[in-house]
């Protein structure tokens, strides 16, 4: 399925997939998720298309994902471990980076899930990774859940209150804080 959608297009549309997305969450990589990760690895090997993962960093799920992809021979320079800033464990993140993957620091503004870091802590983490020499291996983004009609008015309003800047949050809050912390435009 992966290779077909990459080479021929998705469901007869002619629109070709440009990335393979896989997901594991709280509790680690389940057996069915491992099967999917291995299939994604085989599709990557056949096509060269990069792999993006959904993960839960407080459980260090990225370690197992990377281990499976490594076993399959995936070029880890073509792997993005998403949601890596849901925890501030630098040793865990540096371990992933040393293997050659990209980190998605993509849950800004954060802090909505109990026990996860607020945006300021996430930004301090970015500074630490930059200071450790990995500015070229991290990607900042929002993973912003746009208030959707399927949610009731109360949920939509709560999301707006949590992030009134929407897709401008990084520009308006994170980048200025990084500058305050001494990060330059270089």
Residue ranges of model-derived segments:
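Short acidic/histidine-rich active-site segments
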Residues: 105-107, 134-160
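Short amphipathic alpha-helices and their capping/turn segments at secondary-structure boundaries
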Residues: 2-12, 94, 122-136
């Amino acid at each position: 399925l992966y290779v077909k959608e990459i080479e021929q297009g998705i469901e007869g549309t002619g629109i070709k997939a440009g990335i393979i997305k896989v997901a594991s969450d709280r509790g680690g990589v389940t057996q069915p998720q491992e099967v999917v990760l291995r299939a994604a690895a085989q599709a990557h090997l056949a096509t060269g298309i990069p792999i993006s993962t959904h993960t839960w960093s407080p459980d260090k799920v990225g370690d197992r994902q990377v281990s499976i992809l490594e076993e399959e021979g995936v070029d880890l320079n073509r792997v993005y471990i998403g949601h890596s800033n849901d925890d501030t464990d630098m040793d865990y993140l540096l371990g992933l980076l040393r293997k050659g993957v990209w980190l998605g620091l993509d849950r800004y503004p954060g802090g909505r899930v109990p026990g996860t870091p607020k945006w300021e802590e996430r930004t301090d983490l970015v500074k630490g990774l930059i200071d450790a020499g990995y500015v070229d291996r991290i990607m900042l983004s929002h993973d912003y859940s746009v208030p959707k009609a399927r949610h009731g008015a109360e949920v939509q309003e709560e999301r707006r209150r949590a992030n009134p800047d929407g897709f401008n949050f990084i520009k308006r809050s994170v980048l200025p804080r990084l500058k305050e912390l001494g990060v330059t435009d270089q």
